Structures are given as structure tokens and as C-alpha cells.
Amino acid sequence: MHLRITETAFELHLRKIYPTRNILSMRETETVSGQDCLDVQKKTDGSVNIIGEVATDPVASWMIQSAQVASKFTLFTHHAKTFPDLVTALRNSMLRAGVFKDEKTAEEQVVQVLNFDIHLVKDFRGRRYIERVTECIPVEEKNEYTYDYRKEKSLEGKLEKFMDNATIFFTKTTNRELYKYRNILEYQDGNYVLTNPITEANIKAMRNNMDDSDLDGFDDFLQRNWGIKLKREDDFEEETPAEGTKKRGRKPKKTI
């Protein structure tokens, strides 16, 4: 995979870890903005975008852009303590940067790009470890409105059905749930414990980017821990017509 890195200061030094990777690192200067760097990276056929640290509002905007259109996925670091805090912080950054004006719209865009949150902690002994792996599950908006008022004969019945639709509308407008989250992996008493399975959509996306060896190991992991058994897609075979199939069309004329 080709790595495309955007940083405010060079500190990742990934070429020491991945010397054989195609890596392009860029940082903003006084004359070249970070947005210009990101626009250039979109045209360089990158597979993974890495944002060094989302510490300012403009950098949060870069992260959202790169996660939506520029690569297979985006990695970034943030200092939020909980997953809801992460969503709120990124949403507020998008609003302050002027990218969005509405809180719900900004939050909806944020949760669409947050697939997994790998939360690291450092205890008082100086030990650093992964505390949890959390999956973000966007909640799709469903059309729950009905036309039952047409079936009502009386005005009171029609008004009651109308108020039901109005209640649904105001609930979606004022208190709509945009996402759910659940821990996939947790660190408990010195051991890592699998708590919830990965959603079907993310499993499918992950399998589509694996080679045969990784796919076998991943499928075995799913079946062993969560009882999820998946069948690999069969190779496409073009069907050949069976022998003796009658041809459509007019019958040939008989000659005497």
C-alpha cells in the first residue's frame, strides 16, 4: 500500500519502520497550506492517508476530507478520553473551521468516517497499552411516516394520525440518534477480552482488502471467537448452452 502522510511537523518517521513502502510525506509551510498538500496527495494514487495529529480545527477538516475521498482509509491520532468525546471534539472543530453550520450535519459527517477507535492509555507505572477497540455504527435514517390518516373517517381520527407523524418529525429534528458505538476488544485484569462482534458491513469491507492467506486467518478468527461462518465467493464460470437446445425464431422453409 502507498502511504500518504500530512503533518504539521515531521515526527512520524515511518520510513524507518517501512523502508520498502511508497511513502510521500508533506507538511504545511508559510507559503504552502496544509489544504494544498492534501489536494496534491489526492492525485498521487495513495492507499492509506495518515494525519499525524488532529490537534487543530483545520487539521480535523483535512482528516474528514481524506477519509471520504482520498484513500482506502485514514489513520489519525487524537487525545479524546472517550468515544463520545472524540465525536464531539471533531464535530466542534468542523463547526469552528466553518466547514458546516449545522451541528447535526457536522456530526453526521464525522461518524461516517470513524470506523474504529483504538484507545491507548498510560498508567501511573508508565506502562502504555490498548485499553479498548471501539466500533462506530452510524444509524441510518428510516422513513417512518405513514398515510394512515387517509383511512380514518372522522376528523378526530385524521388529526390523531397527523399528530403521530408530527411527533416522529420533531423527534428526528430535535433528538435524532446519529450513531451507536460498542467495544470490540477490552483490556480486563491483564488480559484482552473480545466483547462484541464486528458489524457485517465492516467485516465485508475488511475481507475485500485481504489476500488469500489473510482471508483464511480472518475467517478462522471470526468463526472461532464469534461463530461467524462466511463462504468465500466462487469463481465466475460462464454458462454454456446445453446440447440439443432449440433455437428460437421461425422454422426454416421446406424445399421440395
Task: Give the positions of each predicted feature.
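Switch/coupling sub-region of P-loop NTPases
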Residues: 1-111
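A broadly conserved detector of short glycine/acidic/proline-rich loop/turn motifs that flank catalytic sites
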Residues: 9-10, 30, 55, 122-124, ...
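Intrinsically disordered, low-complexity boundary segments flanking structured domains
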Residues: 11-16, 103-107, 116-121, 162-174, ...
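A generic structural micro-environment signature
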Residues: 12, 32, 60, 116, ...
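Acidic-enriched, low-complexity/disordered segments with a strong bias for Aspartate over Glutamate
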Residues: 36-39, 45, 57, 85, ...
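Phosphate-binding/switch region of NTP-binding enzymes
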Residues: 107-144
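NTP-binding/hydrolysis catalytic cores, primarily Walker-type P-loop NTPases
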Residues: 132-256
